[in-house]
Structures are given as structure tokens and as C-alpha cells.
Amino acid sequence: MAATRTAREVVELYNLVVWNQCNLALAEELFADNVIRHEVGEARTLTREQAVNRVREIWELFDKLRFDLNVVIADDDGEHVAIVYDSTMTTKDGTETKIASIEVFRVVDGSIIEVWNCGYQQGVWN
């Protein structure tokens, strides 16, 4: 039996492979049956299919999309991982936009079950 991925491995794969390479098969592996996405003022529960479709639908808007993880902090509890990222998104007409944010993930048994996102802003971290 294959070893379960660590929470840090899952979060890095999610950002660097699922998002950067639009690897939807891996996304299906990394999401739990249900994923709670927390934002300020609301939380939404997505099924695995909805979570994968979210990646697909965002990728359909862009020709290129890249996340760079500036900071990755894995908590000692083995479940929580915080990331600080910059992202460059290029539309099909060549327009490039840079955004930055911080997210916190909760990973249980190798699957993403919760994500906290405070929103993002245009620009990059200094």
C-alpha cells in the first residue's frame, strides 16, 4: 500500500501541479469528497466534482496560469499548511495579471478538506 502524502506534499502538488499544469486527474486525487472553502463572511461546501470543475473553469479563462509559493508552513498537527503565493495569469489575448494572497489548507488522510482564503489583491508580495 502506498504511503499517504503529507499535508505539505498535498498542498504543494495542488498548487504546483494541479494549478500550474492544469492536472485535473491529480486534482481528483487530492480533494476529499467534500471541500469547505472559507472566505471572509461565508463558507461554501463543494463536492469533489465541483472543486475539480472550479480549477477547469478558471483555466478556461487563461492561456497560462502559474502559482509561485513564496512561503509554505506546515503545522506540527500534520493537517494544516499555510502558503503565501504570487500568481501570474495570462489571458488568451496576452494580457498578464499578477495577484497575491495567503491561504491555509486542512488536509486529512492525504485529502484537502478545508481551505481558508482572505481574498487576493493585484500585485505581488514585496
Regions found by a protein language model. Give the residues of each.
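Short acidic-aromatic low-complexity motifs
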Residues: 2-34
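A solvent-exposed, acidic/Ser-Thr-rich amphipathic alpha-helical stretch
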Residues: 24-79
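Short beta-strand segments enriched in hydrophobic/aromatic residues
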Residues: 31, 87-89, 103, 119
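Residue-level signal for well-ordered, solvent-exposed loop/turn and beta-edge residues enriched
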Residues: 36, 95, 111-113
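Short, cysteine-centered beta-strand-loop-beta hairpins and adjacent loop/turn segments enriched
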Residues: 61, 88-96
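Short, surface-exposed coil-to-beta transition loops
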Residues: 66-68, 84, 97-103, 115
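Short beta-strand edge/turn micro-motifs at domain boundaries
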Residues: 101-126
